[in-house]
């Protein structure tokens, strides 16, 4: 068992972010990492942030810390050893479930003067490797080195085998472009050149800092973007009352502006992410905020100060903007005091802000040295495909595939942002079907930076060239006039581009129905030669493993032959994404314990699938618990190689599949990726109309990998 104790050198070093980033880096490498904070420094009834965020982000087992009050009492009574024994007991309770435990040390402050001494004793008690977590300034290496030196001697100094390295957080003095926020862990962001240069400067004051004796395991830049609170978070800070909360939980404050002059001189401040602060009597500011919102500019919110809240008649006049989610707060504080309180607002991540925590976690993990990480882990640990590792592999495979993906909903804001992310990070070459000026307008309103090589095609300029090919593809089922009319739909137009091999895949559905996305694919792309139907799978990202669920979106009631085909398609999809498939054909009974048409269908489908693909590990009928829970599987199907170990679940009908997928997703708080369509000649994928930007990015990545998989399959078929 490996234990790494994270020791902060002071307040404000980003200790929570450091712990979560290290856990995520381990998780992406298939190492199951747990978290422990033995000693609480929170007040009674306060929730520990790191513990809570770890539980949310990794669905990990947590234990209650020893209360701050109890720590003080024990130390006052001279019972330090007993306190450490209790910490060891808690550690052993958690450690049984993990390969590595990340332990958060005490924060040295004026109240807890004993923190550093107790941290040193804790390191010995847990036999832990120590990582110092500190801020840094590349322009002031002397101060940085002295701060590290001052803490090292408590842990045996540089020569101690216990000291594993230093993680520099919130590093000042680095170029602004080094603070990119990745979609998943991205080792290419690690600042190797900057670390080498900084190490040389540090070694003028401490010859071991930045060497193999005391390595710098990460130089994490300061990021303004990651320090931004939600509009929701400021209400208590400014003693505000909500006039309209709107989208305050989702909007973030990138900047704040105090409006004091005439409105015509302040209009340039009404931009995406801006928090507008103004006296309540300034109805012109309220109206300008409403107009900006109506024009598609997502302001962070509006804070009205002093006196009474605005007249209800004025608010009624602004109803259109209010319905679009504009958050509006009122505070009795004056304007200057409001602005000052916001300026003094801390960088801590609230326990319920999992979106920001996820971004910070990915950001920090990308700057951690994976070679150092691997050197700290016992060689006997068996890597697993965790959700983090799956998403990381997803992005890396799509980058390697270098595919062209067309996005028919080209001016839809989430799609534009997803395309910009994919293009800038090399996930795919994205093609937006939309008027270029419309895309530019969306990007400007939303603060999206469009990459220079992002391709935007005006549908009106290319439609006519697809009329004749479309008539030919439909084999006389429509004439040129009908083809021209159907091509007004950009989904049909994008599907024609795919049919003619001008792109490698298509993603749609942010504003279109599933039928709108899938129907043109059935008509123009058709099924692959080996298949008679199209089905779908969801990748279910459970805490310890990735499951594949099929079919949960397309086929209402497949017969035995079709069910066997869905199983084979799903197994091949699993393989394409690095999952070694163990396929369970799900039914309400296991083996021969039940009877009836539904059970017989599943049994027959299992036999057909085994005959067609003897290379696959398939079993059924199996109940869900017999397929997924090892103890139940051993009891109900002791001779099965799949029972209790299944990772691909094939449901007998759409009702069962869709219900199970949604129940697992909601009740277990499981992230899902999909649906991914399978069985088509070329990849087409449908989005949920409530899809987030990250959902669209991952679907684009899925589509790119599918395109590469199909290309490899065709090449293999030709070779044989």
UniProtKB/Swiss-Prot annotation:
Cellular component annotations (GO), alphabetically ordered: cytoplasm
Keyword annotations from UniProtKB, A to Z: Acyltransferase, Cytoplasm, Transferase
One GO biological process term: acetyl-CoA biosynthetic process
GO molecular function, one term: phosphate acetyltransferase activity
Region (Phosphate acetyltransferase): 389-720
Stated role: Involved in acetate metabolism.
Protein name: Phosphate acetyltransferase
